[in-house]
């Protein structure tokens, strides 16, 4: 049985994968959680923690799929520990570093969190993760998202945010890797803008690209079936 490791993004936890993981029962699906961690000051440190975690649960080979910040961890992991990977994927994520404008925006967001706490940040950012039409049609899902993740500890949310801010560009890794790479994009994603990132899918030797026309940044919730089918198809290539 193949092992699939799903890495959650920033401002959520591993429960975000529950709707999707139930549709992937033919695989061993692992969903590590680092949403409350405060010890890791860089994306590379999260990747080192993940390596130790995988070894501790007996994983020798896996496919790693990272959502948003989880994608940044995935790339750092692929750079440091390639022998463990049969394949990897970026799920609403990017290999680019932040440009200067984005870094300035993040500094303001960081100051907001330091002054007002993580709950205020989640109330502001959570709804923007979903496509507008989905949010309008599913207000309870968005409301539950905000209520659930407003409980995350502020210091952990800030720690993760700082690591995201300081991550390097890893586009070279996509060009150099020999394992299959999956890209899942949301056409309505306001955070990982489709038009700016679709070109990344041309870099790997073996790439599979999925475009979710109606999804924003939360395809595992907005279009669960399409995501599950795409992942199953991809795992057949690894």
Where are these regions (language model features)?
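Catalytic histidine neighborhood in serine/cysteine hydrolases
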Residues: 194, 198-217
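Catalytic histidine-centered segment of alpha/beta-hydrolase-like enzymes
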Residues: 215-228
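Active-site loop/oxyanion-hole signature of alpha/beta-hydrolase fold enzymes
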Residues: 15-22, 27-65, 80-81, 229
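Active-site glycine-rich loops that stabilize anionic/oxyanionic intermediates
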Residues: 9-12, 68
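The conserved beta1-alpha1 loop
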Residues: 7-9, 185
């Amino acid at each position: 049985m193949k092992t699939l490791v799903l890495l959650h993004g920033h401002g959520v936890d591993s429960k975000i994968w529950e709707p999707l993981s139930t549709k992937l029962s033919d695989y061993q699906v692992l969903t590590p959680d680092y949403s409350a961690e405060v010890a890791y000051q860089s994306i590379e440190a999260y990747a080192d923690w993940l390596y130790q975690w995988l070894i501790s649960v007996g994983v020798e080979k896996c496919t790693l799929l990272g959502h948003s910040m989880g994608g940044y961890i995935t790339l750092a992991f692929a750079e440091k520990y390639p022998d463990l990977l049969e394949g990897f994927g970026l799920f609403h994520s990017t290999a680019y570093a932040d440009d200067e404008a984005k870094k300035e925006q993040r500094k303001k967001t960081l100051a907001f969190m330091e002054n007002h706490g993580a709950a205020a940040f989640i109330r502001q950012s959570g709804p923007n993760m979903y496509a507008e039409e989905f949010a309008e049609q599913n207000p309870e899902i968005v409301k539950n998202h905000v209520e659930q993740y407003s409980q995350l500890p502020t210091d952990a949310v800030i720690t993760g945010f700082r690591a995201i801010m300081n991550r390097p560009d890893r586009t070279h890794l996509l060009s150099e890797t020999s394992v299959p790479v999956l890209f899942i994009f949301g056409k309505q994603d306001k955070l990982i803008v489709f038009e700016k990132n679709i070109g990344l899918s041309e870099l790997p030797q073996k790439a599979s690209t999925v475009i979710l026309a109606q999804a924003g940044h939360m395809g595992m919730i907005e279009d669960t079936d399409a995501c599950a089918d795409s992942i199953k198809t991809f795992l057949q290539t690894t």
